[in-house]
Amino acid sequence: MIASLQYFDKIKEIPQFSHLAADSAFMRELNTVNDNVSASKLCNLYASFGGNRHDTDSCVVFFTLLPGNNDVIKYDEDWVNNIVDLSPQISRCLSAINASGYSEYWSSEIKPVLDGYINSYPVSEKAINAIHDAMTEFSGPEILPPTRSNIYILNIDNAFNLSDESFCCTPLLLDVELEKKFRLDFLKVYIHENLHRLSISEQLMQKLDELMTDDFYRDNENVARGHNEGRNEAFVVAAEVFISHKIGRRDNCSVYNEFKEYVDGSLVLAPIIYIHLPEKQKAESLNDFILRLFDNGTIKAGNVKAEYRKAMMKVETSMLQTEI
């Protein structure tokens, strides 16, 4: 139901919700919420502070009482404070959707569809175990918990990870035909989102800021940010591609295409990091490894374009050798 705020267009023509779409006061508050916070952040806050994920009434109460929730207030981070400031609008919108029968609508119309996707998706215990073993090994001293993250299939069009290690995902990624058509892979997305749990230091983020003096990096970074990506996304992409290739979920052609096509090929640090990941030491975190690439001059302002071309040439050569 929380995600329905961002995806209200999916339900606005359904009879029990159509009156809300015609309510100017409701739509004004809904637009205020959606202009200032994403569904993923709302879900993350709710999950982080013990919200009941199976009861819509509890959800409404949580956001209604949010300004007086001391556990939330003392957290004192910008994204949390932003949601607290918006809580009156959020609670009124959720209350209206809930009162219109969202729980019954979800049980009768949405859950059967999501269950169908889940039950028909082919995935083996062996594949899941291989993924978790590879991620645990890759995480080095951080040691990502070997226990599996909870996976929630929501009526949304994207995917995101919650801070409690839950993974929220669109059912479209479980459509085998769409996977084939658009070269998607639910399990690669699962790896990607879980890798966002790895810590990135302020020191490393500062080095990214300093890299904006490099024309080639800056031009591509601006493209990435235009897609709401960029920053440390290149780290995660490099790590996911490395792990997926290692466990056989990507071949050399898939590796090349990911770097050329993902976010219009703008994550130019990703292939640079990728080709050096075999040098990552077992007891070294991804953060410390990338810092080492900065410290030894592999990644530095004025040299990104040359290193990117070198990396892509190596990736392309591996792809062509495979095709021979």
Question: Where do the PLM segments sit?
Answer:
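N-terminal mature-domain "stem" immediately C-terminal to a signal peptide or N-terminal signal-anchor/transmembrane
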Residues: 1-69, 263-278, 283-286
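Active-site scaffold of zinc-dependent metalloenzymes
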Residues: 72-78, 132-133, 148-184
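Auxiliary, metal-adjacent structural segments of Zn-dependent hydrolase domains
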Residues: 106-164
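Soluble non-cytosolic domains of exported or imported proteins
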Residues: 122-129, 181, 185, 189, ...
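An active-site-proximal "capping" alpha-helix that borders the catalytic cofactor pocket
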Residues: 131-138, 230-245
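Active-site recognition of the HExxH zinc-binding catalytic motif
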Residues: 184-205
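Post-HEXXH active-site segment of zinc metalloproteases
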Residues: 201-228
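Pan-zinc metallopeptidase signature
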Residues: 240-242, 248-324
